[in-house]
Amino acid sequence: MSDVQVSDHPEVERYEISVDGRRAGLAAYELEGDVIAFTHTEIDDAYEGQGLGSQLARAALDDARARGLKVKPLCPFIRGWIKRHEDYQDLVVPTT
């Protein structure tokens, strides 16, 4: 079984997911006050189809919740993931 880890790298504004110590993908964001805007998510081609995008989204959103942040899902992947997981919809910043 592979060792999968998600970590926040605030100095470059992104969460990274790694498999056995190798970066497999990222979720880029911009942080403004108490709002985190996810702008781009990507998984390396070598790791596609393994559910890593979902693991990355869940971990990043769980971290946002723990930090008391609201989410602006600009990235289509994160936006779609939240739509499919009702228990995360409360994190989304209402649009005006």
Where are these regions (language model features)?
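Conserved N-terminal entry element of GNAT/NAT acetyltransferase domains
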Residues: M1-D8
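Histidine-centered active-site/metal-ligand motif
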Residues: H9, H40, H85
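Structural motif
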Residues: H9-E11, E32
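Conserved beta-hairpin
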Residues: E13-A24
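A short, internal acetyl-CoA/4′-phosphopantetheine-binding micro-motif in the GNAT/acyltransferase core
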Residues: E42-E48
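Conserved acetyl-CoA-binding loop-helix of GNAT-fold acetyltransferases
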Residues: G49-A60
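C-terminal structural segments of small proteins and small subunits
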Residues: D62-T96
